[in-house]
Design a protein with these regions (language model features):
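Aromatic-lined substrate-binding rim segments of carbohydrate-active enzymes
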Residues: 37, 85-114, 158-185
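Surface-exposed, active-site-proximal loop segments in enzymatic domains
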Residues: 85-92, 117-133, 162, 224-225
Length: 280
């Protein structure tokens, strides 16, 4: 009872007489750490965006014809960039003339980059620091050369193992974008349990806009059904807004539907058709 068990800083345990133990000495430490404050490039008005499918440089020449009857849109996103190989190189269809014409019509231009090439692995590119940063550098260089207002990231069918690398890519790209006055947006599928690795909450901290791809509820190979039923879309919006501020969330809606047919052999087929054709 006259002894106290004590331990040294390096782990040795022993005993010392109580009378030789002084009162406890308490030191209060103040935290100097400050959480990082993020700033965002957002528009003063709601974003009304239209994606423009561009598959060749010649297609850029038809910008005026393509947009002559377009109303209500303030951002156009041409599909100009694609990751072409595992070194993070980018193929580009960008056109400064296209951007100039869009600006004359009062449109902002966000160049889209996809991961659709069969010659690259998204996991390989994004998990490799050199390849990932090469991708980021090329995107920003192309964007500045063409006079773009922003970059739209459309990386689809991401596996669970690439989730953390995708987020790191967005973090790094957002820094470069903001240093060069470029808006950064990212496309996401409607939230489901199997897409939780997209981590929309973390995305919402670093990108300017999170876009919900509110379509493909039913698709080729699935059961017959709506491309985007109202309850399904509403739930997707609700789940996204639980993680991302509403003012930086965009809902993308489909201007197409699917025509479902059953063959004589009983097989279910479907064909994507535009709204004009669907009305016929």
């Amino acid at each position: 009872e006259d002894w106290d068990q004590v331990a040294t800083d390096d782990g040795y345990i022993g005993y010392i007489q109580k009378k030789k133990v002084s009162a406890a000495d308490t030191t209060d430490y103040k935290r100097s750490f400050k959480a990082e404050a993020y700033s965002y490039f957002t528009m003063d008005e709601p974003v009304n965006l239209a994606w423009h499918q561009v598959t060749s440089t010649d297609a850029n020449n038809y910008f005026a014809d393509t947009t002559q009857n377009m109303t209500g849109v303030n951002v156009i996103s041409p599909t100009w960039f694609s990751v072409s190989d595992n070194d993070g190189n980018v193929s580009s269809l960008a056109s400064g003339e296209y951007v100039m014409q869009a600006h004359e019509k009062g449109l902002k231009v966000w160049g889209l980059v996809d991961n659709f090439s069969e010659n690259m692995s998204t996991t390989t590119v994004l998990s490799n620091t050199a390849a990932r940063q090469n991708l980021e550098n090329q995107l920003v260089t192309y964007a500045l050369k063409a006079g773009l207002d922003g970059i739209n990231v459309d990386f689809e069918s991401l596996s669970e193992d690439v989730g953390i690398h995708f987020l790191q890519f967005l973090r790094e790209l957002s820094i470069q974008c903001h240093e060069n006055n470029l808006v950064l947006s990212v496309d996401n599928p409607v939230p489901e349990d199997f897409t939780s690795h997209y981590d929309r909450a973390e995305q919402g901290k670093v990108v300017d806009y999170v876009i919900i791809m509110g379509y493909d509820e039913h698709y080729v190979g699935s059961d017959a059904g709506s491309v985007a039923s109202l309850p399904w879309v509403e739930q997707g919006v609700k789940d996204t807004l639980a993680e991302v501020p509403a003012k930086r969330t965009i809902l993308a809606i489909p201007f197409y539907t699917r025509l479902w047919k059953t063959t004589e052999g009983g097989a279910l087929t479907s064909e994507a058709i535009g709204m004009d054709q669907a009305q016929q």
